[in-house]
Amino acid sequence: PYEKIGAELVKEVAKKTDDVAGDGTTTATVLAQALVREGLRNVAAGANPLGLKRGIEKAVEKVTETLLKSAKEVETKDQIAATAAISAGDQSIGDLIAEAMDKVGNEGVITVEESNTFGL
């Protein structure tokens, strides 16, 4: 039963991460798995589950605060290209994404579809 609960939790973490950020699902899954594993280990060793939950919540608040302080706005076409290139692992894809975003604007929608034609 615990394995199924853990699997559902990790699945939900990955889905939520993908919905909110669109990236980072592997990192979120690894972190969730570590939290579950260490949480169960600590509870088995006698830790108070509610105290453990409160500690995790405080840690999440602190990490979120630290990340928000170090976050930088991505505003220029070059910054968008660089960010997209890192995410895609390919500079040419980063440039294409930046060009598409430049054309549609911040509120625009970009649709990506599979094609059998090379280069399109």
UniProtKB/Swiss-Prot annotation:
It comes from Mycobacterium intracellulare. Its main location: cytoplasm. It comes from the Bacteria. It is an enzyme of class 5 (isomerase). Its EC number is 5.6.1.7. The keyword ATP-binding applies. Together with its co-chaperonin GroES, plays an essential role in assisting protein folding. The GroEL-GroES system forms a nano-cage that allows encapsulation of the non-native substrate proteins and provides a physical environment optimized to promote and accelerate protein folding. Forms a cylinder of 14 subunits composed of two heptameric rings stacked back-to-back. Interacts with the co-chaperonin GroES. One of its GO terms (cellular component) is cytoplasm. ATP binds at D23, G24, T25, T26, T27. One of its GO terms (molecular function) is isomerase activity. InterPro entries: Cpn60/GroEL, Cpn60/GroEL/TCP-1, GROEL-like_equatorial_sf, TCP-1-like_intermed_sf. Belongs to the chaperonin (HSP60) family. The keyword Chaperone applies. PANTHER family: 60 KDA HEAT SHOCK PROTEIN, MITOCHONDRIAL. One of its GO terms (biological process) is protein refolding. Keywords: ATP-binding, Chaperone, Cytoplasm, Isomerase, Nucleotide-binding, Stress response. Changing R37K: In strain: 1299 and 1373. It is found in: Cytoplasm. This is Chaperonin GroEL. Coiled coil: none annotated. It catalyses: ATP + H2O + a folded polypeptide = ADP + phosphate + an unfolded polypeptide.
